[in-house]
Amino acid sequence: MENLISPEEVASMAFAPLDHITTDDINPLTIACVQERFIVPILGEAMIEALLRGDYADLADKWVCPALALYTRALMMPALALRTGAAGVSKVSNQYLDAATENELRSLRRSTLAQATTLLRKAVARIESAPDRYPEYDPRMNIWRRCRIDGGVVV
């Protein structure tokens, strides 16, 4: 499946300029995994295909793509804090910056996931408020209608 957003879009939507994240830091495979893990189970394959065709550009630009970018950022955080090389795995640090603690990383990741989920919930609310406008969306396929996780608890 094609990605809804590019590494360039992830860099511009989910990271601040001072984060110094380049498109080389963002693997398209990570975006694809995030899209399959977080977006497809909510919106469904047919809706994703419609978004890829350019249908519903307003919905994609305002809610779905920013959510995908933030989910991608959250999934990238451990990889950004650690580097894998011939010598093994090492923590990123330099003389000017200290690496974040595990607690700080967890807190930032949780906050980023919450922002992404809020955007995706807004997209779903907009879609479900006008079902005739979005015929590709099948609410029965939305996993949030069957299972929800709030604060790490399955509801």
Which functions belong to the PLM regions below?
Residues 103-123:
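Amphipathic alpha-helical coiled-coil segments
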